[in-house]
Amino acid sequence: MRALVVYCHPDPASFTAAIRDLVLARLEDAGAETRLHDLYADEFAPGLSRAEWQGYLNSPENRAPVAQAADDLDWCDTLIFVYPTWWYGLPALLKGWLDRVLLPDLAFLMPDRMNRTIRPGLTHITRLGVFTTCGASRWLTLFVGAPGKRTLLRGVRLLCAKRCRTAFAAHYLMDSSTPASRNAHLVRVGRAMDRLTGARPQTRQAPA
């Protein structure tokens, strides 16, 4: 198993960091080779530049500005996102990562004479995990449409293998969370990771 974990949070001491640590621990337990992209620590620039836009369709030259991320996306068979939900969607850095890294001839194939729509390019990815926290309630998030979750588990998922296995866990109402609720969520994340990797259930958890 080759796992790429894309992590996005500005605070190294956040609860989201604890979720990341648990995800990494479960991958280690499953014997996975793992690469971590910490978007804040890496000072990832989310804005698609004019030059990138003008060269967007020029493959493989379009990979040059994000070469490491593109190589890691091409390398992995397991893709996991760990992030906070802000305004019901993805943080700007993570959305920018999708904009700049999910490129033509890498993440998808553009329409051509034989195909009227795009085709999946990430068919080597057979596992997709999404782990997030939300300030809003589950009901309100669903009422708005859960755009962040939909972007990843529907939009990105469509680019992956047809039988791509998925996992999702969200801690809602984070602003009123308690040690008990956070610990319970870590248990859910651990179980979701075990299902995603096919590993036997573990007792290992990251501290809250």
How would you describe each model-predicted region?
Residues P10-A13, T85, G135-W139, L173-S176:
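Short histidine/acidic/glycine/proline-rich micro-motifs that form metal-
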Residues M1-L106, V187-A208:
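N-terminal beta1-alpha1-beta2 submodule of the flavodoxin-like/Rossmannoid cofactor-binding fold
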Residues L140-F143, P147-A208:
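Glycine-rich phosphate/pyrophosphate-binding loop and the adjoining helix
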Residues L109-L158:
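Short, glycine-/small-residue-rich phosphate/pyrophosphate-handling segment
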Residues P104-L109, K162-T166:
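Short, structured loop/turn "capping" segments at alpha-beta junctions
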Residues C76, V82, T123-H124, V156-C164:
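A structural motif corresponding to the C-terminal end of an alpha-helix
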Residues L39, T133, H171:
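Active-site donor-binding loop signature of nucleotide-sugar glycosyltransferases
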Residues V82, F131, Y172:
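Conserved residues at the C-terminal ends of beta-strands
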